[in-house]
């Protein structure tokens, strides 16, 4: 990858990519094993939430995404720069999503970290979707239809959680597909 995020998609991706690059330059990496370097915890926290948020707005997320977050929090909570993480989440309208992911990790998966305040109804709706999401179809046409209709059918994800207008999602999708030679068909 030339960039960390898909910077052709929209301004948010470009700006958040710049935040992640600055974070890498500031904090550096740490060695996992001889010859293997990995970004530090704050970088990974921002990246994991952004990755899950992109899936959440398109087709939804599954338990695996939530388990990844719960395991990450359990292991790296003390290493995260929480002020920087919170600022990034608020600046890019992912704070509600991060709170839902963290609250679900604490309440449903037993992550032993401080749980944020979340509206119970929204957390219940979030978990219902996570636990009942059907697999993505294998055939190209049903796959395309699901990708295109999912955000409209589940507008609450965009409006209430990510605070993004539905039209903006579709605009960014068309623009991103134009720049990426229509990967939506894959």
What residue spans do the PLM features occupy?
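Conserved NTP-donor binding/palm subdomain of two-metal-ion nucleotidyltransferases/polymerases, i.e.
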Residues: 1-186
């Amino acid at each position: 990858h030339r960039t960390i995020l898909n910077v052709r998609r929209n301004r948010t991706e470009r700006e958040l990519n710049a935040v992640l690059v600055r974070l890498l330059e500031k904090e550096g990496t740490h060695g996992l094993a001889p010859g293997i370097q990995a970004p530090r915890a704050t970088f990974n926290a921002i990246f994991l939430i952004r990755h899950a948020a992109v899936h959440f707005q398109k087709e939804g997320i599954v338990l695996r995404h939530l388990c990844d977050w719960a395991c990450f929090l359990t292991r790296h909570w003390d290493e995260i720069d929480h002020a920087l993480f919170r600022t990034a989440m608020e600046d890019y309208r992912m704070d509600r999503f991060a709170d839902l992911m963290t609250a679900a990790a604490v309440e449903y998966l037993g992550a032993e970290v401080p749980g944020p305040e979340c509206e119970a109804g929204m957390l219940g709706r979030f978990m219902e979707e996570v636990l009942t999401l059907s697999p993505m179809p294998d055939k190209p046409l049903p796959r395309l239809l699901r990708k295109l209709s999912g955000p409209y059918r589940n507008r609450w994800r965009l409006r209430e959680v990510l605070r993004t207008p539905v039209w903006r999602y579709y605009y960014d999708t068309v623009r991103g597909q134009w720049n990426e030679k229509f990967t939506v068909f894959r």
